[in-house]
């Protein structure tokens, strides 16, 4: 009777899932798992969470299935769905690893093979974009440092120009004083 109840909850969850009632399906799968662990219920829970865009919890469910002793089909499908979940979160390196693990178990899965290559492509794009952003930040930092250096040089040049101007004025004043003294001396004679 206990196994019947657990399977009944799974069937009820499957029915809810089929009709698009993902939150109800989630509840039924969780109730089933509370009674007794069942890899299929955990897998289906992951699917229900994924459909609700609760990717972190879905990833936990799929990962839990892969860590249990299950059939190779469920394990391969769990890795595949884990890959899809990681792709939805733009975690391309993790998605790549999940698809790779799925293909180790089921090397004939063409969908997993396609998704593996797509994840690889997205990962390369992401890395290139990150490199471009880093290069841009580095360039901005260099530009800022150069601008500060230019401003310092400009200030130093202005100070030097001002000092030179003051020295020139002082020399002119001294020269004028000397000229006046000479004129006074000449006028006395």
Residue ranges with predicted function:
Residues 4-35, 51:
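Alpha-helical segment of the N-proximal tetratricopeptide repeat
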Residues 28-36, 89-96:
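Short, charged, low-hydrophobicity "junction" segments
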């Amino acid at each position: 009777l206990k196994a019947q109840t657990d399977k009944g909850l799974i069937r009820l969850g499957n029915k809810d899932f089929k009709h698009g009632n993902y939150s109800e399906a989630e509840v039924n799968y969780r109730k089933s798992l509370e009674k007794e662990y069942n890899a299929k219920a955990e897998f289906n829970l992951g699917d229900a969470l994924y459909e609700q865009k609760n990717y972190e919890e879905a990833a936990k469910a799929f990962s839990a299935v892969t860590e249990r002793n299950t059939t190779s089909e469920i394990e391969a499908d769990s890795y595949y769905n884990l890959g899809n979940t990681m792709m939805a979160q733009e975690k391309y390196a993790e998605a790549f690893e999940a698809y790779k693990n799925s293909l180790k178990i089921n090397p004939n899965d063409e969908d997993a093979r396609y998704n593996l290559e797509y994840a690889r492509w997205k990962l390369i794009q992401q890395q290139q974009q990150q490199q471009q952003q880093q290069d841009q930040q580095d360039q901005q930092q260099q530009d800022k440092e150069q601008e500060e250096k230019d401003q310092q040089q400009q200030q130093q040049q202005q100070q030097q120009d001002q000092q030179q101007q003051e020295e020139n004025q002082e020399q002119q004043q001294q020269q004028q004083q000397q000229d006046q003294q000479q004129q006074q001396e000449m006028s006395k004679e």
